Design a protein with these regions (language model features):
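Conserved C-terminal alpha-helix-loop-beta "cap" of PLP-dependent enzymes
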Residues: 265-266, 270, 340-383, 391-396
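Conserved core of the PLP fold type I
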Residues: 58-199, 203, 209-234, 241, ...
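Generic structural signal for small/hydrophobic residues in well-ordered secondary structure
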Residues: 24, 36, 51, 82, ...
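Conserved glycine-rich beta-strand-loop-beta hairpin in the small C-terminal domain of fold type I
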Residues: 289, 306-316, 328-341, 353, ...
Length: 420
């Protein structure tokens, strides 16, 4: 007898949605399409030769380690390297504070598994990272959404949501995905103080913090938390769990991220990871360590910044040249994305259908809102990625997209002749 599989699925799977971005990427595989949809790093800046050399060296010198099971916590030299690397941003951690994960997406899943019971409330930004909503929703999270503006999360709107006692808050302070905004230093202090006042942990997701193209680096929340607690003894206690990744600085295909947290939190996460995949690939961790060593990672990040800064500037210039004046957008100081706001009455989902016919793709904004976080607000927004397309492709793609935008806006009200 054939199994009726749908009757066997766990209750927690019923609310799971496919990633809108993963679905869009199927469309963008067509060669004629210029895609601003995925958050893809530029493949031409991958250090491919460095990886080839590292793979050969690891297999020649340490195959007995690279091809064997490893510690769940991760490859110790890599954990030590990460601790040294993040120290330059003021994060005082030891290797015992670092857990290597299979990308920061696994880190989000492990945190959801650790902290969320069905029905627990999680405070998130509106809009926020789609992958976090997917990870947390599996464990039955309800959401409390707080809006963002050009300075990031509205800290003046945090007190009442925090007073209601969410399990934790999830924030992306640097060059937020999807908005491209950065949480101001003043708001960072306010957020940390309020979280401490109400005893709410913070999950600080920082995949883009090293990709700053202008301005000064701002202190991570985890650093401000240490200052607030008046502790200078390393990362023994604290209210912040910090996440980051090699996906945006080396390559996403190696699937390596990390969690930095107090040892008692790391030990519980280690137990959960053991049940998930035992450990992240030993071979890949050793290769990544070999690639990043001898100051290569720092120099490579400088290259990435130059490339992405140029592409951001090209996109901003093209938007100014081609888009109608009633359409606005953010001017990110780093990261991979900018956020476009259409006038009232416009619909990014319908715009996408028109854009497809012009062979250009983006991500409509509604998928970046929690179910109770006013997703209808997202229908006036679209996320554009500027890292993966070449400057010439960006210019052409924005021109194509402007044609689709003008067609939709003409349906709302006639445009001046010069803008058609």
């Amino acid at each position: 007898m054939s199994t009726a599989w749908t009757s066997r699925y766990a209750q927690r799977t019923k609310g799971i949605r496919s990633s809108a971005i993963r679905e869009l990427l199927k469309f963008t595989q067509r060669p004629e399409v210029i895609s601003f949809a995925g958050g893809l790093p530029a493949s031409e800046v991958f250090p491919s030769e460095r990886f080839r050399e590292a793979c050969c060296k690891v297999l020649e010198q340490k195959p007995h380690l690279a091809l064997q099971y490893g510690a769940t916590e991760g490859y110790e030299p890599l954990r030590e390297m990460i601790a040294r690397h993040i120290a330059r941003y003021g994060i005082k951690a030891k290797s015992e504070n670092v857990l290597i994960t299979s990308g920061s997406q696994q880190a989000l899943d492990l945190i959801g598994k650790l902290l969320i019971n069905s029905g627990d409330r999680v405070l998130v930004e509106a809009p926020t990272y789609l992958g976090a909503l997917q990870a947390f929703s599996v464990y039955g999270a309800d959401y409390v959404s707080v809006p963002c503006d050009e300075d990031g999360l509205r800290s003046d709107m945090l007190e009442n949501p925090l007073r209601s006692g969410p399990k934790f808050m999830y924030v992306l302070p640097n060059f937020q995905n999807p908005g491209g905004t950065t949480l101001s230093e003043g708001r960072r202090h306010e957020l940390v103080l309020l979280a401490d006042k109400y005893g709410i942990p913070i999950v600080e997701d920082d995949p883009y913090g090293q990709l700053r193209y202008e301005g000064e680096h701002l202190p991570p929340l985890v650093v401000l938390d240490r200052e607030n607690l008046r502790r200078d003894d390393g990362y023994s206690i604290g209210n912040v769990i910090y996440l980051s990744t090699f996906s945006k600085t080396l390559a996403p295909g190696i699937r390596l991220g990390w969690i930095v947290a107090p040892p008692e939190v790391i030990s519980k996460l280690v137990q959960l990871k053991q049940g998930a995949d035992l450990h992240s690939s030993t071979f890949v961790q050793m290769v990544a360590h070999e690639v990043a060593r001898d100051n290569f990672l720092d120099e490579h990040i400088k290259l990435i910044r130059r490339v992405y800064r140029e592409r951001r500037d090209v996109m901003l210039e093209a938007l100014t040249q081609h888009f109608p004046p009633e359409v606005t957008w953010t001017r990110p100081k780093g990261g991979l994305f900018l956020w476009v706001t259409l006038p009232t009455g416009a619909d990014a989902q319908k715009l996408f259908e028109t854009a497809v016919r012009e062979n250009v793709a983006f991500v409509p904004g509604d998928c970046f809102y929690a179910p109770n976080g006013h997703p209808e607000e997202g229908r006036r927004h679209l996320r554009l990625n500027f890292s993966s397309a070449s400057p010439d492709q960006i210019r052409e793609g924005i021109h194509r997209l402007s044609i689709a935008v003008k067609k939709q806006l003409e349906g709302l009200h006639p445009l001046p002749a010069g803008m058609r």
